[in-house]
Amino acid sequence: MIEIKHLKTLQALRNSGSLAAAAAVLHQTQSALSHQFSDLEQRLGFRLFVRKSQPLRFTPQGEVLLQLANQVLPQISRALQACNEPQQTRLRIAIECHSCIQWLTPALENFRASWPQVEMDFTSGVTFDPQPALQQGELDLVMTSDILPRSGLHYSPMFDFEVRLVLAPDHPLASKTQITPEDLASETLLIYPVQRSRLDVWRHFLQPAGISPLLKSVDNTLLLIQMVAARMGIAALPHWVVESVERQGLVVTKTLGDGLWSRLYAAVRDGDQRQAVTEAFIRSTRDHACDHLPFVRSAERPIFDAPTAKPGSQPRL
């Protein structure tokens, strides 16, 4: 049986013109290459080339195998190249959180610089329930804090962030050292237009204590923060979202209870996380977020190891 390495050896012999030159190209000794040809000819039952011919002359059988090498080897090379190239040339992305768009846009630009051949399709507006579309193949990746059990989806951790209470500087709660669920009972909580069961502040802070404040939906982050500053309500937002306006003194933030932390994931269909494009995108966006967002930490760090703001880091609002 003839193998690919035999075809490559024949081609090297034709291109170099002598056994000694072919051995040098193939990084073998001349005697080893000669022995390899002798073994192959014995197995095939015919000679491949005329020894000591000047110039080197192939037998008719050798010419047939050379033609085979010229046909097969380029096909193998192209097939291997295709295997190493990204199978995905389009990445359809959606997010489940309003505030993610502030850092995801520059992260997309950063990824595109390294993968210009990949078409990025970012769902316009903010989709709050895109995981069913991901399951059905209508999307390729969803940024989410919610894990659906037995969904056939794979969730890659991106980073951890603290959800903090956002208040006007002159709000009565701004002077409290610790915020309890009961402190929010009579407040108006400004939220994004999403079911309250999807909110971390509801699931992990208010609901366990049986507290149900008045909820008011606002679909724009900047407007929501302005309403908080105007004493039209309070909010619970990722710390990095409000870091710059807090430094300006427009709002203050307080820790909820002992600290309310959440984790962002990149969700894909199980198996797709091994696609070259998907893997590179997740790694690129995770690194970008951890390098540029204040008050976030790698999902690999312990939950009790609180991060600090990175000098000069400012979220886009």
UniProtKB/Swiss-Prot annotation:
Pfam families, sorted: HTH_1 (PF00126), LysR_substrate (PF03466)
Database matches in PROSITE patterns: HTH_LYSR
GO BP: methionine biosynthetic process; regulation of DNA-templated transcription
GO cellular component terms, semicolon-separated: cytoplasm
Cellular localization per UniProt: Cytoplasm
Gene3D superfamilies: Periplasmic binding protein-like II, Winged helix-like DNA-binding domain superfamily/Winged helix DNA-binding domain
Domain HTH lysR-type: 1-59
Record keywords: Activator, Amino-acid biosynthesis, Cytoplasm, DNA-binding, Methionine biosynthesis, Repressor, Transcription, Transcription regulation
Listed SUPFAM superfamilies: Periplasmic binding protein-like II, Winged helix' DNA-binding domain
Domain of life: Bacteria
GO molecular-function terms, A-Z: DNA-binding transcription factor activity; transcription cis-regulatory region binding
Keyword Repressor part of the UniProt annotation: yes
Regions recorded as binding DNA: 19-38
Task performed by this protein: Control of the last step in methionine biosynthesis; MetR is a positive activator of the metA, metE and metH genes. It is also a negative regulator of its own expression.
Family: Belongs to the LysR transcriptional regulatory family.
Protein name: HTH-type transcriptional regulator MetR
Species annotation: Salmonella typhimurium (strain LT2 / SGSC1412 / ATCC 700720)
